[in-house]
Amino acid sequence: MIYIRFIFFALLLSEYTAVSAVSVGENSPDCLLDSISPHKDIVKLEHPTNKVLYVDFWASWCSPCAKSFPFMNHLNRQFEERGLQIIAINLDENPDDIIPFLRRFPASFSIVRDKNQQCAKAFSVQAVPSTYLIDKQGRVRYIHLGFRPSETTQMLKIIQQLLDE
């Protein structure tokens, strides 16, 4: 089953070659996303928001994604009142895979779904998890692929710097 998901994600990524990658310093793309809530609201990711955005692309089958959720919960507790907004964008093909994942790894931050992969294409996502830190003016300031607990100190420093600007 993991092999099939890998093949699906590889095929998904193959569509990104024609799209130029979002780079540090560029404006963040605007996206329409589906809320993971009983109301099924449409969420618009747009800028500027006067908040620092931590945008994380993830999938339920991704082991590093699961490891990143406690860190994002920690960030949300520590920095939400200072203006950090965490938006975790799910890329699963089957939306039914999301709820069991969230039961195992609860989230205190916004979870949305990119059902047509349009936001992932706009950001030129190459791997999951992929994290984009976006400043209050809507510029991408930091991009990180993967998740390793040993690298969280650097990310904390960057978030604090962006919140202080």
Annotated model-derived regions:
Residues 1-9:
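Sec-dependent signal peptide recognition
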Residues 8-32:
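N-proximal helix/coil linker or "cap" segments that precede and/or mark the start of modular domains
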Residues 29, 77-117, 122, 128:
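Conserved segment of the thioredoxin-like fold in thiol-based oxidoreductases
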Residues 31-53:
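A short beta-strand-turn-helix
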Residues 51-53, 57-61, 127:
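Short pre-active-site segment immediately N-terminal to redox-active cysteine/selenocysteine motifs
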Residues 54-56, 88, 132-133:
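Hydrophobic beta-strand core positions in alpha/beta domains
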Residues 57-74:
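Conserved redox-active cysteine motifs that mediate thiol-disulfide chemistry
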Residues 100-107, 115-158:
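Thiol/disulfide oxidoreductase modules built on the thioredoxin-like
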